[in-house]
Amino acid sequence: MGDVLSTHLDDARRQNIAEKTEKILREFLRFYEDQYGVSLFNSMRHEIEGTGPPQAQLLWRKVPLDERIIFSGNLFQYQEDNKKWRNRFSLVPHNYGLVLYENKVAYERQIPPRAVINSAGYKVLTSLDQYLELVGNSLPGTTSKSGSTPILKCPTQFPLILWHPYARHYYFCMMTEAEQDKWQAVLQDCVRHCNNGIPENSKVEGPAFTDAIRMYRQSKEQYGTWEMLCGNEVQILSNLVMEELGPALKTELGPRLKGKPQERQRQWIQISDAVYRLVFEQAKVHFEEVLCKLQLARPAMEAVIRTDMDQIITSKEHLASKIRAFILPKAEVCVRNHVQPYIPSILEALMVPTSQGFTEVRDVFFKEVTDMNLNVINEGGIDKLGEYMEKLSQLAYHPLKMQSCYEKMEPLRLDGLQQRFDVSSTSVFKQRAQIHMREQMDNAVYTFETLLHQELGKGPTKEELCKSIQRILERVLKKYDYDSSSVRKRFFREALLQITIPFLLKKLAPTCKSELPRFQELIFEDFARFILVENTYEEVVLQTVMKDILQAVKEAAVQRKHNLYRDSVVLHNSDPNLHLLAEGAPIDWGEQYGDGGDGSDSGGSPCPSEAATLTEKRRRAKQVVSVVQDEESGLPFEAGSEPPSPASPDNVTELRGLLAQDLQAESSPPASPLLNGAPVQESPQPMTVLEASPPASPLRHLPPGKAVDLEPPKPSDQETGEKVSSPGSRPPIHTTTEDSAGVQTEF
C-alpha cells in the first residue's frame, strides 16, 4: 500500500490536491457565511412569532438510550494488510459506531479496540456481485473479465460489505443467512443514524450549512437531491470536495495504474481513501475556523436583529413583492405545465410505503405491550415488571424488531419521475421516513412508560395493574395515531418540495437568474447580512408550488385512504398534565422495580460475588439485543433463533377478553417465554458505555498512558471512519492521517 501511495501521491501531487481543496473550501465557506446570517434571522423570527406545527400528543425522551449497547456478537472481517479473514468481537453502542475488538477477551480486559467505524455515507451490500459492479463503475476500464480473479474472495456465501464512493471499504462475512440478515439490519441502522449527523436541535448552524450546500451546488449547475448529504458537517464538506476532485484525479491517475483490473481497482480504492483523508483534515480545520469566527460575531448580529426586527421584516417583504411581480407569471406557467400534473402520482408513491411503515410501527408497539401484559399475568405481576419494562423501553432501538417497519419503505420507487425531476436516488426519502418511524415508536414507548410509572404510584394489585396497562395502551395509541398523521403529512410536504423546487429553479434559471442582481439595491446595507436576494427568490418560487402541494396532501387526508387526520382535527391540550410528568428524572425500571435484591439476606449486604452477579445482571438487561457467541466456537454461527411467540390478539376487544379470562383464573398458568427483546444467548460482559450525546459530539481523546475504561469507545462524528490500534498494545487513541506508532485513523 505504501508503494502505491508514494508512487501516485507524491509531495507535488499532495500539494496540488491541497491547493484545489483550499479553493473549493473557500468558495463554499463564503456561501456558508452568507447563509449563517439569514438562518440566524429566521431562527429568531420564528422564536418571536411562535409559528410551528401543532403540539405533539406523545412525549419525547430527552436522553435516549443512555448507557445502552445496541448489539454485540462475532463476525469475520477481512484484513487487507495480510489478506486474511479474522474473527472479531463486535458491538454497537448507543451512538451507532461499529466497534471491533480482537476478541471478546480483549473487550473484557479493556484492551483498546481494533477499529471504530463511522458508517456515514456507506452502503450495506449483501453480495459480491453488487460490490464488484460498484467497484467496476468507480474506475472505468477495470471491469474484470469473466472467469478472472475478483478483487475479493469471500469464504462463505453470506458477505456484508460497507462500500463508500471515496473512503475505504470494509468486508465482513457470516456463516448463515440468518446471521447475515441480523447484521445487515444492525449495520443499516448504523448507516441510517450516522447519515443523520447534523443535530435537529441546531436551529442556526444546521440550516445555514444545508442551505449553503444547496446554493453552492446550484452555482455549479447541480440541482436535485444529493445522495452524499450524509454525516456531520465535515464529512459532508469532504464529500462535496471529493465530488469535484474525484473525476479529475481519476482521469489523471487511472491510466497510470498498473496490473490486472482487480489490482488496479484495489490501488484506486487505496488512493481515493488517502485523498479523502487529506481532504477531511483540511476541511475540518477550515470549517472550524469559520464556525468559530461566526459564533464570535453572533452576539452582535443578534443585537441588530432584536433592535431592527420589524424593519428587517418590512424590507424583506418589500423585496419579495418586487421579485414576485417579476417571476410569478413565469413560475405559475412552469408549475401548471411541468409540476402540477405529477404531484398526485409522486404523493401516492410516497404515501403507500410510508403509511404501511407507520402502521407496522403501531402494530409492533401494540404486540409488544400486549405480550408484556400477558406476561405480567402469567409471571407474578409487579415482581417482573421492571425486567419487562426495561426491555420495552428499548424497543425503538431494537434493529431486528424494527426491521419489519423499516422494510415497508424499501419498495419506494419514483419510476418515470426520477429523471424528470433529477432525483438521483430515493434513499434520502427512505431513510428520513425510517428515522421518523423510530422517533414515533420511541415517543409512544416513552409516553407509555411515563403513564404506567404514574399508575404504579397508586400501588395497584396485579389485576388492577393489567387493566391499567390496557387502558394506558389505548390512550397512547390514540395519541400515536394523531402524531403519526401529523409527522407523515409534514414528511410528504417536505419530500414534495425537495423533489419539485430544484426542478423549478433549474427550469426558471435561464430566464430569471440573470435578472436577480438588480434587486440587490432594494436591500439596506445594514440588513444585507440577514436578507439575500437568492434566498428570497427561492422562497417566492416555493410559494408558487406550495399551495398545490398543500391541496394534494389535504385531499389525501379527506379520502382517509392512508389513515391521515384532516387538518381541521387538532387536539389542543387533550392531556394538559402529561407533559409535566416528563419533567422528572428518567425512569430506571431495573433499579426501581427489578427483583435483583430478593436473594440477599435481610441482615446485611450481599457478598462480593453476589453483588458482582447482580451488577452484571443489571448491565445485561440494558443491552438491546445480543448474538454473542462463545470464543471456543471460533466461527460466527448463529446464536439461535428467538422462541416463537404465541398468537397475539389483533385488537383491543380481543385483548380485553383474554385479560378477563386470565384474571378470573384461580392460579396463574405456566410462565410463557418473555417476548420483549430478551437476548437468546448472553455471556457476562461489561456493558457500561459513554454518556449519551448528540450525533455531532466530538471525540474524547484518551491521555497518553491512561488505561481504557470499561466503556466501549465512541466513534467520533468528527472522524470519518475508524481508529485502529495494533493488537496487544495500549496506545493513546488520537487523530492522524498518517501511520503512527501503533495507532492509525481509518475512514
From Swiss-Prot:
Similarity remark: Belongs to the Niban family.
Keyword presence, Membrane:
yes
Q: What gene, per UniProt, encodes this protein?
A: Niban2
Q: Which GO terms describe its cellular component?
A: adherens junction; cytoplasm; cytosol; nucleus; plasma membrane
Q: What biological function has been recorded for the protein in this entry?
A: May play a role in apoptosis suppression.
- Species of origin: Rattus norvegicus (Rat)
Where does the UniProt annotation locate this protein?
Cytoplasm, Cytosol; Cell junction, Adherens junction; Membrane
Q: Phosphoserine: which positions carry it? A: S568, S574, S605, S626, S641, S645, S648, S667, S672, S683, S693, S697
Q: List where Polar residues composition bias occurs.
A: 734-747
Which intervals carry biased composition (Basic and acidic residues)? 708-722
Tell me what this protein is called.
Answer: Protein Niban 2
